[in-house]
Design a protein with these regions (language model features):
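Hydrophobic/small/kink-forming positions within alpha-helical transmembrane segments
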Residues: 62, 103, 167-168, 197
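Alpha-helical transmembrane segments of multi-pass membrane transporters/permeases
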Residues: 94, 149-175, 190-193
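Small-residue-rich hydrophobic transmembrane alpha-helices
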Residues: 43-103, 140-159, 251
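Transmembrane helix-bundle signature of multi-pass secondary active exporters and lipid flippases
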Residues: 17-69, 133-140, 202, 228-251
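Hydrophobic transmembrane alpha-helices of multi-pass small-molecule transporters
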Residues: 55-58, 170-174, 199-204
Length: 251
């Protein structure tokens, strides 16, 4: 990245980044299109659940942008130890936050759906769809972290591929599960879940060849050795991204 021509470098990083950010919206678009052929209640259920999905994505961007920005700075300073610690911290933090969101969401699924505007006729569909979507919260949040960390290390193309594969798989699985297997709105939710796990797997297990720093539990546990100044920097990088994502899709 320090020797490549600037125009080519910008194109190589900007185009995959734009595509990756657009593709994250395809999950809801695909689900809305196909469940719209079932009934209006199913369409409303997907719309109601989108607010929760936006919150999950916000935490993914929060951890991903913050850790990725920090990693790129540490790599430039040749501080590989701190970069490795932050890579693990961002990844495992997002995964644990996703687990917490899933747990709380499933425990309070009924009141959450009602608070988001579910009517008595929409409520069963919303609970079915959102309940399955919440199971994928850890994978959705952490895959966004992996995507952002790889982009900040200059591997924007592979980061884009990992996200695109999941979106394309979702578009293919939606009609199969909804209509062929007659699973209805549950099929749309399971399609999204499977696709997100697929993206997560590609980025996690095939990414190390292109990612300079692995995500190891020892590095995560040693996060406490990061200086207070570095932890403050990480938060200052993270907050604008996470807050912006939430404000883009207000509840």
């Amino acid at each position: 990245m320090t020797t490549a021509p600037v125009p080519r470098l910008i194109r190589g990083l900007a185009v995959p980044t734009i595509i990756s950010m657009l593709v994250t919206s395809f999950y809801v678009m695909a689900d809305t299109y196909f469940v719209g052929k079932i009934n209006t209640q199913s369409t409303a259920a997907v719309g109601i659940s989108f607010s929760i999905m936006a919150i999950i994505q916000a935490f993914g961007f929060f951890c991903g942008h913050g850790s990725g920005n920090f990693i790129s700075r540490r790599l430039g300073a040749r501080d590989y130890r701190s970069a490795e610690k932050m890579a693990a911290t961002g990844f495992f933090s997002a995964f644990l936050i996703g687990c917490a969101i899933a747990l709380v969401g499933l425990l309070f699924l009924d009141p959450i759906c009602r608070a988001l505007g579910s009517t008595p006729t929409i409520l069963p569909y919303a609970k079915t769809y959102l309940g399955i979507i919440l199971l994928g919260a850890p994978f959705m949040a952490s895959s966004l972290v992996l995507n952002n960390q790889m982009r900040f290390q200059g591997n924007a193309v592979y980061a884009m591929i990992g996200i695109i594969v999941g979106a394309v798989l979702n578009i293919g699985l939606d009609p199969l599960l909804i209509f062929v297997f007659d699973m209805g709105i549950a099929g749309a939710a399971w399609s999204t879940f499977i696709s997100q796990v697929c993206s997560f797997t590609i980025l996690l297990f095939h990414g190390p060849k292109r990612r300079k720093h692995p995500h190891s539990l020892p590095a995560f546990y040693s996060h406490s050795s990061l200086s207070e100044r570095n932890r403050i920097r990480r938060k200052s990088f993270s907050l604008p991204s996470g807050t912006g994502q939430c404000l883009d899709y207000p509840i």
